[in-house]
Amino acid sequence: MTEKIVLPPQSGKPSDVERIKTESNYLRGTLERTMNDPLSSGIPEDDNRLMKFHGSYLQDDRDLRNERQRQKLEPAYQFMVRVRTPGGAATPAQWLVMDEMARKYGNGSLKLTTRQAFQVHGILKWNVKKYMQEINEVLLDSLAACGDVNRNVMCNVNPNQSALHEEVYNWSAKLSEHLLPRTRAYHELWLDGEKVIDSQDDEIEPIYGAQYLPRKFKIAIAIPPSNDVDVFSQDIGLIAIVEDEKLIGFNVAVGGGMGMTHGDHATYPQLAREIGFITPDKLLETAEKIITIQRDYGNRSVRKNARFKYTIDARGLEWFNEELTRRLGWSIQEARPYTFERTGDEFGWIKGAEGKWHYTLFIQNGRIKDFQDYKLLTGLREIAKVHTGDFRLTPNQNLMISNVTPQKKKKIAAIIEQYKLTDGAHYSALRRNSIACVSLPTCGLAMAEAERYLPSLITKIETIIDETGLNDTEIVIRMSGCPNGCSRAAMAEIGFIGKGPGKYNLYLGASFTGNRLNKIYRENIGEEEILAELRPILVHYAKERLVGEHFGDFVIRAGYVTAVYDGREFHV
């Protein structure tokens, strides 16, 4: 029998979130009552904290907030539900249900996230349970899509190595399943499972314990030469090592993470550091033991310092390696060589193994809906009706129609043509390499616009791009509405992080291959200043770049910023 987990003594008073988790009866709280309370479209904050473990955030429409306050109404509460899709894989049947959920219960759109998951926004409280039950019918769920647990496990999307990719994808699915919370609360609350009145004495979380992790935890697997998952931004980054076209194991990197707090230099983005190599049969055990180290030693007092990166930085990588070896009972091997070439996606039709085809669509900022002159949601619905392969959500918020048989390719190509679905070929390379988080109006943390603003800002930057002949030059550009890092803006060659309405910090100098952070270049500037700052740098780059030199490398060589390979130097 598995014994209950007892945490070692903690320093500092536990945060209020730790109290909520401890008292929650394994994530139940009072959710059953408050989600059925007809007097409010929202729920109390304690239950909102627990809803995250069930894959949902309570939000409100911030565009309406002031007017509703004036009318003495409660905020326009709504729920965002994030669906867990390991490796970004979804069947056509699952796609059709997500499409229906967006139109039936949401705001009519799907958001593809930078962690290869679906998000549906605008769900009213009374519809959340129906939503959960209907996605369950096609074997989808939102358990652990948010919260202080391991989140959606990411996996490289690489059609050029289809057989290998499938093997690696299967490992991402196994990791996701192995690290799921074991509480029955999700099934009780949303799927009408048998109720457990008080499970404190008989329910066990064999990996997490009753308090779960100090903060969220993220894992991704990359297959070189593609680093589309931004493997060094993860708590655990796994790099598939291939010899003679066969997977022999994974290099393991630990302690990455993007979030920080403006003005607090004790918080910073950080790159995961490689600690060695493991064979595939050791993967689940190694990941579990790493998570238990964070469970036991992570900061449960100050949440902004609770991520795994701070645990490692506070105690040292040598301490971590010794502790991991102690828990495993064996030492991992030396890291193996590999090379990354890019973090972006390859668009259009690509022929993979076994004669099957893959088509990658450019989805600007991951937003799928029927625009006035671009029926993207409808077009993809029609493809899902005839497609016999699968869909792959990419870490760059794009979409791959994957494993298309030669027999279906003509039909799907015709639908792509009919609805003018785009691979982005007519867009600038800058736009094709852009990412933005949702931000306003639904994100409660947003300080500035992101998804609604970045496309128009890029249009203005493209004027400079056109003038300098850089239209086909790939430059990674990302925008976050706050410093929490959902768009991984700290790993962009040009990064924007919101400071306030219409104001951003401008960061430069991350690497095109995803192994270096950027650094602040200008603080708290608006659009006019952004364009004025970028113009001379882009002109300089166009004139004096070396052959094959990426923008992020150039701005370091030219002295605009210094290189950052350790997050503790991010603010220096």
UniProtKB/Swiss-Prot annotation:
Pathway: Sulfur metabolism; hydrogen sulfide biosynthesis; hydrogen sulfide from sulfite (NADPH route): step 1/1
Keywords assigned: 4Fe-4S, Amino-acid biosynthesis, Cysteine biosynthesis, Heme, Iron, Iron-sulfur, Metal-binding, NADP, Oxidoreductase
GO cellular component, as recorded: sulfite reductase complex (NADPH)
Record-linked InterPro entries: CysI (IPR011786), NiRdtase/SiRdtase_haem-b_fer (IPR005117), Nit/Sulf_reduc_fer-like_dom_sf (IPR036136), NO2/SO3_Rdtase_4Fe4S_dom (IPR006067), NO2/SO3_Rdtase_4Fe4S_prot (IPR045169), NO2/SO3_Rdtase_4Fe4S_sf (IPR045854), NO2/SO3_Rdtase_FeS/sirohaem_BS (IPR006066)
Domain of life of the organism encoding this protein: Bacteria
E.C. number(s) listed in UniProt: 1.8.1.2
Cofactor note: Binds 1 siroheme per subunit. Binds 1 [4Fe-4S] cluster per subunit.
Cofactor: siroheme; [4Fe-4S] cluster
Binding site for [4Fe-4S] cluster: C437, C443, C482, C486
A biological-process GO annotation: cysteine biosynthetic process
Any one GO molecular-function label of the UniProt entry: sulfite reductase (ferredoxin) activity
Protein name, as recorded: Sulfite reductase [NADPH] hemoprotein beta-component
Organism this protein belongs to: Lysinibacillus sphaericus (strain C3-41)
Lineage, opening ranks: Bacteria, Bacillati, Bacillota, Bacilli, Bacillales
Gene: cysI
